[in-house]
Regions:
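Structured, solvent-exposed acidic/aromatic patches
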Residues: 1-220, 259-261, 269
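C-terminal functional modules
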Residues: 210-340
Length: 340
């Protein structure tokens, strides 16, 4: 209940109430992580929907090139910035099915200057935000969800199709990360910078990153992390990889001028740690305007500040008036057009 109060008061900008919660019991250690644990049971169905929708019959959609950028998954050329190194969670978050660059009909954006990325490199097949080009038959080539959090495959350069029996996976025994201890640390770091709560935002951010890394890296279980062809090469993230990443983020934080710039870094790291949870990033984006996301390739209208009611509800209940995408929820007091 205290962590729910933290979430609510962060949304409403109530720093005093958050200060009162600092001495209370909140989700701040990994053994308290609030998550739903999926299993391999089929009666009743309990397999992760991320696995179910992307592994048995090939992946069901395109990953975001912008998210690849946040993880520094590509070829380390501009506009790849942030830490300057691959995120240690990369091979746990994402799985590549093909050791081949997309081209021809598989890359309809090639040569179009309207795209920020089109293709990021390193065999990460995704799409830019808002790309509505035709869809080729590439569902067994696109990059998809890895072992975390959906219980898929660890990317050890095997490049097997996800629907192949030769692809070792956790068979969908993943989790739904509803609210993790790492999230709490990022939330408090945000409160320190944005609401004046008396906490060490830098230290909290570092702790949040560490908690996220530990959870993700532990997730591969018995899956092999060594190279498919050379077992002397191990792609598992090491403590040195994690320490290097955190040190680079902290150096970036120290160099940032003012709380607003520091807040942007905190939110970016929370965003990266939220993989598998769309609710917290949606709230933080409406609350802070961060992280800075890729502009859509084509105009898509105003950013949805709230969700519309489902048609099943409005059709069956004449007392429900359909809302509009730009309608703001009660705690969203930022100006109209705050997010474009």
């Amino acid at each position: 209940a205290n962590t729910l109060k933290l979430k609510a008061n962060l949304n409403m900008g109530n720093g005093a109430a958050i200060t009162d919660l600092l001495s209370e019991n909140i989700i701040d250690t990994d053994d308290e992580d609030f998550q739903f644990n999926y299993s391999i049971a089929t009666l009743p169905e309990s397999i992760s929907p991320l696995f179910q929708g992307n592994y048995p019959n090939g992946t069901g959609g395109y990953m975001s090139n912008g998210f690849f950028d946040f993880l520094n998954a590509g070829d380390a050329e501009a506009p790849f910035v942030e830490t300057g190194i691959e995120d240690p969670r990369l091979r746990y978050y994402l799985y590549r099915q093909k050791d081949q660059d997309p081209s021809g009909s598989s890359l309809p954006c090639a040569g179009n200057g309207d795209y920020d990325y089109c293709y990021v490199g390193n065999f990460y097949w995704g799409r830019d935000h808002g790309d509505d080009e035709g869809i080729p038959n590439d569902n067994t080539k696109r990059t998809t969800f890895g072992v975390y959090p959906g219980g898929g495959a660890f990317d050890n350069n095997q490049y097997n199709r996800v629907d192949s029996s030769n692809t070792p996976t956790l068979n969908g025994e993943g989790i739904n990360p509803i609210f993790l201890s790492s999230f709490t640390h990022f939330a408090l770091a945000e409160a320190g910078l944005d609401l004046g709560v008396g906490v060490d935002s830098k230290a909290l951010m570092a702790q949040g990153i560490q908690l996220s890394m530990d959870k993700v890296i532990d997730f591969s279980g018995a899956l092999s992390t060594t190279d498919e062809d050379d077992e002397t090469i191990d792609y598992a993230a090491t403590s040195a990889n994690v320490s290097d990443y955190i040190a680079r983020v902290l150096a970036e934080y120290d160099a940032a001028s003012g709380n607003e710039a520091k807040l942007a870094i905190v939110i970016r790291e929370w965003y990266n740690a939220s993989w598998g949870n769309g609710i917290e990033p949606y709230n933080m984006y409406r609350r802070t305007g961060y992280p800075t996301l890729q502009t859509g390739v084509f105009p898509v209208g105003p950013f949805p500040r709230s969700f519309r009611y489902p048609s099943s509800e409005t059709n069956s209940n004449p007392n429900v008036n359909q809302t509009t995408a730009d309608n703001q929820v009660f705690w969203d007091t930022n100006p109209a057009g705050f997010i474009n």
